[in-house]
């Protein structure tokens, strides 16, 4: 069963004290699969699932922190062609601010 619920992100706190700011609000559609709530965005490498919206939001934020550190801030020489594409998408959607 699908739901019309969405999660909207505008910024995420990073472990280094900086903020990951969305250039435009990122709206993610929540789909119900059994008792799980699922969010997927292939362009940004997001595929998260949890049992509550609060836990799902935390999971999305944690995933984006990892994706940002590993791919957006990663050296191009260390990334595969597919990972470079993800890096470019992340840099298109987000910026890091103090």
Where are each of the predicted segments found?
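Short, charged, surface-exposed hinge/linker loops at domain edges
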Residues: 1-25, 54, 58-98
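Short aromatic-glycine-(Arg/Gly/Cys) micro-motifs in beta-strand/loop hairpins
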Residues: 23-42
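Short acidic, gly/pro-rich beta-turn/loop elements at beta-sheet edges
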Residues: 38-40, 49, 72
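A short, exposed loop/beta-hairpin motif centered on an aromatic-Gly-Thr core
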Residues: 42-54
């Amino acid at each position: 069963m699908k739901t019309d619920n969405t999660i909207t992100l505008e910024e995420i706190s990073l472990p280094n004290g900086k903020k990951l700011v969305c250039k435009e609000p990122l709206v993610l559609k929540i789909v119900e699969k059994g008792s799980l709530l699922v969010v997927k965005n292939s362009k940004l490498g997001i595929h998260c699932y949890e049992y509550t919206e609060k836990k799902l939001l935390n999971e999305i934020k944690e995933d984006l922190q990892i994706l940002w550190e590993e791919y957006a801030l990663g050296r191009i020489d260390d990334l595969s062609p597919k990972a470079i594409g993800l890096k470019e998408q992340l840099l298109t959607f987000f910026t890091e601010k103090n």
